[in-house]
Amino acid sequence: MIASALSFIFGGCCSNAYALEALVREFPSSGILITFSQFILITIEGLIYFLLNDVQSLKHPKVPRKRWFVVVVMFFAINVLNNVALGFDISVPVHIILRSSGPLTTMAVGRILAGKRYSSLQIGSVFILTIGVIIATLGNAKDLHLHVESMTRFGIGFTILVITQILGAIMGLVLENTYRIYGSDWRESLFYTHALSLPFFLFLLRPIRSQWNDLFAIHTKGFLNLPSGVWYLCFNTLAQYFCVRGVNALGAETSALTVSVVLNVRKFVSLCLSLILFENEMGPAVKFGALLVFGSSAVYASARSKPKTNGLKKND
């Protein structure tokens, strides 16, 4: 299961990152439409799966629906805000930099809210991993300052991403505790976190419609005479399905910190692929960053977490 989850994460998430970068280059304010498309596809696929294979999970889910509510609110906010941030002068390289603090945030929140304790090897490896991603990204974001036309807008985007990091760490702990209490079922998690989020999009119908119309406003046509942006959106949505499928499957088998570390390594791989596919030079910074990322990941894999002193309480 873990090997399968990793293949989905690195295959789906890296493909998703490529399509996302191509899309936001032409449509930087398409974040809400991107998120909505992803949620629709994943919900439809999940509904078909359960209707054909496991109707009982729709009637009587392993995890109570009211338990999912807190997770769904955070999950929806994280996904929407992450994509919305790209419209506030946050370039893809900067996006990777700011989100690379995930493992550190997970550790801090885990220590404060759940009383988790981590070994020195884990703390050191996560810190070095984060530094590696930042060095590699900064070394190749040569035009970083050109994207910051307004420090106020950049500050808003930065704040949004900080909030999503904290929410993501809290959500990871809640999910970890939920799986410990009720048992893990990544299929159920994938479906309910997306399906129960759909009503929130009713408040965002106007920007969704506007962003969809923007895709058809360009003159560049692709396959079947559809705008290239539509195809990038379709590819991004499909890739995101495989990405979140892998993340949910991994989260059902491992800790929140392990998921965060794996996603950080994935971000670095996405950066390297972005450099290659967009014909950017892979300079010394990327090579040095690679050494830090993969070296620290190997150290983390060999480290073990100390038992929690006190976990989150069951509160339904």
From Swiss-Prot:
Keywords: Endoplasmic reticulum, Membrane, Sugar transport, Transmembrane, Transmembrane helix, Transport. GO terms for biological process: UDP-N-acetylglucosamine transmembrane transport. Its main location: endoplasmic reticulum. The keyword Membrane applies. It comes from the Eukaryota. The chain crosses the membrane at residues 4-24, 32-52, 68-88, 121-141, 154-174, 188-208, 215-235, 275-295. Residues 25-31, 89-120, 175-187, 236-274 are lumenal. GO terms for molecular function: UDP-N-acetylglucosamine transmembrane transporter activity; UDP-xylose transmembrane transporter activity. InterPro entries: SCL35B1-4/HUT1. It is found in: Endoplasmic reticulum; Endoplasmic reticulum membrane. One of its GO terms (cellular component) is endoplasmic reticulum. NCBIfam families: nst. PANTHER family: NUCLEOTIDE SUGAR TRANSPORTER SLC35B4, SOLUTE CARRIER FAMILY 35 MEMBER B. Belongs to the nucleotide-sugar transporter family. SLC35B subfamily. Sugar transporter that specifically mediates the transport of UDP-N-acetylglucosamine (UDP-GlcNAc) and is required for cell wall chitin synthesis. This is UDP-N-acetylglucosamine transporter yea4. The gene is yea4.
